[in-house]
Amino acid sequence: MSGPYEKKMAVLTDLSTSSHPVTKDSPTLPESSATDMGYYNGHLSTGQHDFFQTQAYSPTISSYGYPHPPHPQYNFNGLVGNESFLPKDDYQYGYRPFVHYREPPVQETVSVKEEPETEVRMVNGKPKKIRKPRTIYSSYQLAALQRRFQKAQYLALPERAELAAQLGLTQTQVKIWFQNRRSKFKKLYKNGEGPDMEHSPNNSDSMACNSPSSPPIWDNSGSRTPLQQQQQQQSLPQCSSPSYLENYHSWYTQQNQSGQHLQPSEVMHQPPPDTVY
């Protein structure tokens, strides 16, 4: 018991040297420690606990070998004076409001991640993407797109935006339509075929019939009678259509049967009757 007690006294002696230096003539350690303890006890406020709780005869041995109180309690009332020191517990911006504002974004991100993907479906145990529905164009939209495609097969961004706004379509739909039409025409020309009559402007656009019809290769109007010219005008339609070839073929057959044959080479070098030299 004497060993821990002497170590305790040595620690207290070291603390007292900061305010009162120890002289060489100090007889023993217990007298110095007793004086120091009286000094500290006298300067602290009366009626309060000591700055150090001295439990000298019931210590707990620490891992370092010297005794210390199990739960040291400090009293700062003597240092401050009669006023008591109270820490400020309430703050202007607490932690709970911050947590409250941070919780909704976290819940939102989790809910977005948990949404199932509607474009992927399991078919026979394998994921398969659902194909988007095909865009259905009206006859007016097809006619306007076809007219614009005949003018230019490639559209600039402002032109594409303007055309999409006029037809009530998106720019992506107009872009895809032009891409499909270009690839289709390239495939037809590669195979040696012309554009089919189904998608020609004569069938897809009713306003394209206002264009003048192409004249025949040779003109034999000078040798025909007025009755024959009237029959030709009646047989030729006002707009170019698939029936135009049939009417022209029937008219040409009637001309051959009447016995009036003209060589194309002679007619082509023949000047028209109204030419003035």
UniProtKB/Swiss-Prot annotation:
InterPro entries in UniProt: Distal-less_Homeobox_TF, Distal-less_N, HD, HD_metazoa, Homeobox_CS, Homeodomain-like_sf, HTH_motif
Entry's Gene Ontology BP terms: embryonic skeletal system development; epithelial cell differentiation; regulation of transcription by RNA polymerase II
Comp. bias regions, Low complexity: 226-243
UniProt cross-references to Pfam families, sorted A to Z: DLL_N (PF12413), Homeodomain (PF00046)
Region of interest (Disordered), residue spans: 1-33, 191-277
Record family assignment: Belongs to the distal-less homeobox family.
Name by which UniProt lists this protein: Homeobox protein DLL-2
Organism of origin: Xenopus laevis
Organism lineage: Eukaryota, Metazoa, Chordata, Craniata, Vertebrata
Name of encoding gene: dll2
